[in-house]
């Protein structure tokens, strides 16, 4: 946890009582306080991810930026990390930016998305992004947005028929329809 306070793990560091309390608070918040005496190498990927979040928390950030925070984690670990992120936002009012290719576990806590379309960034609310046609274009493969009877949503690839495989969905005419939110404007008028 010293890395979060000092920026380095090596050398002699004098840690104040207040800093120790902040570390304990961050570890408790992320659910890793009981692992304080373990070496990082002894922890699972999910616990390591929560250690990294706790390290960031000791500095009282207003913004937390994460790159693929759920990558290579089992479902239980993904859920635990998402739970911590949701609490950070709801209880501490922290803004969280996440780079992720697989959105499914994050969908319940996402409010918007910045996505790259033909090399240009665009922002949209999640309701606008969760569109099969747009996501098919962004992922470069056919996908569908599925809503469960409980109201949960997830994005999944559409099984392709052998002669229905789309080799490249990024042709110029298709890209043009999504630029400048033209797609979202047309979608709004059609409803």
Task: Locate each region found by the language model.
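Conserved ABC ATPase "signature" region
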Residues: 2, 16-35, 41
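Conserved ABC ATPase signature
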Residues: 39-43, 47
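Conserved catalytic motifs of ABC-family nucleotide-binding domains
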Residues: 60
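Catalytic Walker B motif of ABC-type/P-loop ATPase nucleotide-binding domains
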Residues: 64-68
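H-loop/switch region of ABC-family ATPase nucleotide-binding domains
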Residues: 100-101
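H-loop (His-switch) and adjacent beta-strand-loop-beta switch element
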Residues: 112-126
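ABC ATPase nucleotide-binding domains
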Residues: 138-191
């Amino acid at each position: 946890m010293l890395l979060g306070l000092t920026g380095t793990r090596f050398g002699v560091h004098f840690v104040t009582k207040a800093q120790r309390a902040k570390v304990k608070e961050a570890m408790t918040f992320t659910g890793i306080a009981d692992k304080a005496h373990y070496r990082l190498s002894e922890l699972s990927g999910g616990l390591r991810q929560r250690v990294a979040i706790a390290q960031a928390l000791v500095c009282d950030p207003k913004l937390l930026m994460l790159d693929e925070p759920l990558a290579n984690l089992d479902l239980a670990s993904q859920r635990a990390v998402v739970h911590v992120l949701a609490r950070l936002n709801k209880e501490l009012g922290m803004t969280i930016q996440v780079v992720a290719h697989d959105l499914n576990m994050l969908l319940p806590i996402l409010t918007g998305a910045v996505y790259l379309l033909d090399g240009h960034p665009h922002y949209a609310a999640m309701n606008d992004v969760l569109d099969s046609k747009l996501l098919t274009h962004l992922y470069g493969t056919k996908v569908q947005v599925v809503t469960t009877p409980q109201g949960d949503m997830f994005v999944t690839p559409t099984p392709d028929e052998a002669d229905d495989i789309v080799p490249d969905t990024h042709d110029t005419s298709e890209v043009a329809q999504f630029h400048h939110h033209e797609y979202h404007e047309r979608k709004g008028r059609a409803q």
